């Protein structure tokens, strides 16, 4: 059966590649695809058409997308974008590498190192002198941290770049999330610990077993699908008050890596999940659910809480907001820890992820044109189009140059159908996705403009925020401290492969956790299941002897680089 599934996935991946070949940058040899777009005044303009594949799920923009065509009119180019469907990133990228044929742009996600090792990307630094928006996107020191072992830059990390200062209003990262209806029912209590969080959900479900339409409420979901099983396994380091280094805890005093998987807090956390599963609070379908089913279930408004990254469930939030009858079913983050008195660090400042990014492939027929396309996407006028839309349609500008939106504009920005037809942020291309617009007056988008952001909220969220004395999602959590020199360590672990000893251990850790942690959560005898898991974990994963020393070496390297050594 597994072989059949892998074969089916490979066929789907091949179909995806063939589909892009027919419509994007790798069509006829030595010919760059072009098409005609209509301008706002009805004129026809011929533009270049590039192709891109992003090895993550996403929403495809509609043909004739208004903002995409507006951008194309101004810069003379557009990009047809395909997203991951029906297979893993490794499977999709593996098919491309095997066929040695690629779209013009690729973000390979977890298949990035394979792409670089296969020689699939061109060296961006061989071209960037003629494209200042790209070359100046990062500092020399930041570019040096992105360089491959041969000294070249093959990818551009797209996310987390700040213009001037961070002004974010949305906690886009990981948290324990809870619906505003649950908090309102309990008169907006202060929730500080894991026990308090689940106690509130238990009491709410007991008092409110069903939705108004009669469907059962669900207390808690846990996404375990593929690489997204972080929703199950990494909460212990947050509960101990550490930021999201992803692969380990880093002791702030000794700068030594600690394995969060085996701490006392980890055992207490999984024991709590086990208890909640037995009580019926945790959805019994949760450990076998695929990502699409998880998003669908959240979109119904039935799920009271979960751990997740906000960007990972944003599509569900959009669906809830667009429904019109589920305003009290949207989520806010709560900064809980394992015990009272532990200082939480759920929110962090933007950080550079050197393990991933977008690259131009060797199949691209017009490398200079592709560089120019990315360069133009970073022009101030185009950034505003990407992030805000069209003035007078998606936002207004007052006499002081401040951007505002009407209720209709705000509703449109939360309607996925409208977004697909009218807006085009080119989200997986380089962007200043934090901080200010280049005009120095406005946020880079509506989620970074505090006054506009608050006005865009529905009354249920405003009531919740007012009750807690805040105006943004970020203010629901502790203020983020300055990032440490080693942060984030997940940018190191994301790049590990089975070609190294530490990469082998890292891969085996994931296998063991995928296999045993769901069993731990549903076991009749938790202690026996936990002991079996730890025994298998320690037998199969040389964490202390191989992985932690590798982490420690990387931590010290980053500290030395930051110190200029």
How would you name each of these model-derived features?
Residues 6-9, 23-196, 242-249, 256-259, ...:
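Conserved N-terminal structural module of periplasmic/extracytoplasmic solute-binding proteins
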Residues 44-50, 75-79, 99-104, 118-122, ...:
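Loop/turn elements at helix/coil->beta-strand transitions in domains of secreted/extracellular proteins
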Residues 114-127, 152, 316-344:
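Ligand-binding "clamshell"
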Residues 152, 157-230, 251-297, 302, ...:
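Helix-loop-helix "hinge/cap" segment bordering the ligand-binding cleft or interdomain interface
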Residues 247-255, 261, 266-269, 326-354:
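Active-site-adjacent "gating/activation" loops or surface patches in catalytic cores
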Residues 384-515, 524:
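Conserved small-residue motifs centered on glycine
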